[in-house]
Amino acid sequence: MEIFSLTHANDIDGLGSAALLKVAYGMGSENIFFTDYSAEGLSYSIKKLSERIGKKSITLFMTDLGMNDYLIDTYKKIIMKVKKQGGKVVWFDHHVWSLSQIKKIASLCDVAIIGENSRYCATEITYRNLISGKMLSKNNKFLRKFVWIVHKSDFNKKPEKRKDYELIGTYAMSIMSYITLGPSEIRDKKLRDIIDVIAAGRFSSPRIVSDGRKFSDRNERLTKIMLKNLYKIGDIAFVGFSPNLQSTLGCGAIMDKTKCDIAIYINTENHTGHLRSRISDTTLLSRRMGGGGHPHASGFPIDRKRFSGFGSDASRKEFVEFLAGEIEKTYRG
């Protein structure tokens, strides 16, 4: 039965879990599809994936795809298509979901290892269930190290060795440079290239490093601009606005400058909000906003009809005022 993958486009955990599927099953790169957590991004990916599957009976692995409640019907469409055609669906994830959605999705899948997991990311779950203890690859030592790197990256833990830390940065910056292209064949090809490099037993390539370095320079420049005009929400949060920053670094820069508990970076290009916290559970706020993630790192979509843009100080203040109200209800209500 042919293997397909639908995974998270925006970080190395999504790409890493797909790379392990390629190692385990020899899955063709053309069978790997990517999505973010937006309705538009998911609809694009489901359409492309469905066209590729056609009427075949296949096994679909869905990895690192946190379930935002409002997207469940879209996910169900592809799951039901695969099942109707005699295929199987396996879902590996580690994000915070509502219990009701966990039960709904688990009942539809053949295998579902889902819900909050503070120990293992999606790449680790994939490795532990499909590769660990099996001589599937001559690169087992490499795979163990790669999975460790992904764990450090996804749980925001800094490795001791500088080269490992730099590799995490290379992944983050190169992936971000590709996803700024938006859902497209060009984006997907570049992300598949990263997966091919990893599946072949290499951590990176000259092109990945070069693309990451270019985006890093841009990211640093835009971050400096963002930090000149931050918005404070009580004694708990600061908000910054900028197009297409790497979210962890954007929030980290806000935290470093303000020493706040919750840093909120608003991607003005994608209309998404990104949260990082030292203390508070950010999923309480992100889920209220229609998003999700991890306790100390999460995100949410922004309604384009209600907030059409953030080009002016007035439009940003309007959104910050809205956020302040949601924070009040979430943490002090």
Q: What is each of the regions a protein language model found here?
A:
Residues 2-50:
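Anionic-ligand anchoring segments at beta-strand to alpha-helix junctions in alpha/beta enzyme folds, i.e.
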Residues 177-214:
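Long, charge-rich alpha-helical interaction segments
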Residues 2, 55-57, 84, 206-333:
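Gly/His-enriched, cation/cofactor- and phosphate-binding structural elements
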Residues 101-183, 187:
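Short alpha-helices
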Residues 37-39, 66-70, 246:
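Short acidic, S/G/P-rich loop/turn micro-motifs used as interaction or catalytic elements
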Residues 83-89:
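A short helix->loop->beta-strand "cap" motif at the edges of active sites that frequently abuts
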Residues 46-78, 83:
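Short, structured active-site "lid" loops
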Residues 11, 21, 64, 93, ...:
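Divalent metal-coordination and catalytic microenvironments
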